[in-house]
């Protein structure tokens, strides 16, 4: 099992007003999880609270050492919610719960290739 992550950051076209304050940008990570058979699972970690960014960053670095699914699953319960969601989504895709052959993921639209991750992340 191999976990990769890539940081993203972009300004919102319009500020987003929430009960916790105003968001002018989104920051987070794209997760790419690959099993030993080459199957992929994708997730996104984008905490709304700024203080959660540092926690997610530290936890993601620790998860780089995880070499088994069991280690990743054990990390879910102690992780910040945004990280647990992103990792859970990647694991669910590996399990065929989303993006199954009966209902495959569509190809990324051309503008998505302009994201900082580019072809290297999607290949």
Regions inferred by a protein language model and the residue ranges of each:
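N-terminal capping/lid subdomain adjacent to the active-site entrance of alpha/beta enzymes
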Residues: 1-123
């Amino acid at each position: 099992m191999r976990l990769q992550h890539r940081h993203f950051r972009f300004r919102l076209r319009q500020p987003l007003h929430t009960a916790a304050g105003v968001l002018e940008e989104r920051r987070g990570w794209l997760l790419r999880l690959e099993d030993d058979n080459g199957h992929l699972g994708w997730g996104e970690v984008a905490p709304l609270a700024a203080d959660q960014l540092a926690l997610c960053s530290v936890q993601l670095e620790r998860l780089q050492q995880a070499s088994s699914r069991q280690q990743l699953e054990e990390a879910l319960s102690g992780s910040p919610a945004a990280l647990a969601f992103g990792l859970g989504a990647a694991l669910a895709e590996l399990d065929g719960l989303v993006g199954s052959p009966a209902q495959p993921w569509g190809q990324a639209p051309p503008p998505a290739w302009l994201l900082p991750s580019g072809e290297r992340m999607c290949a």
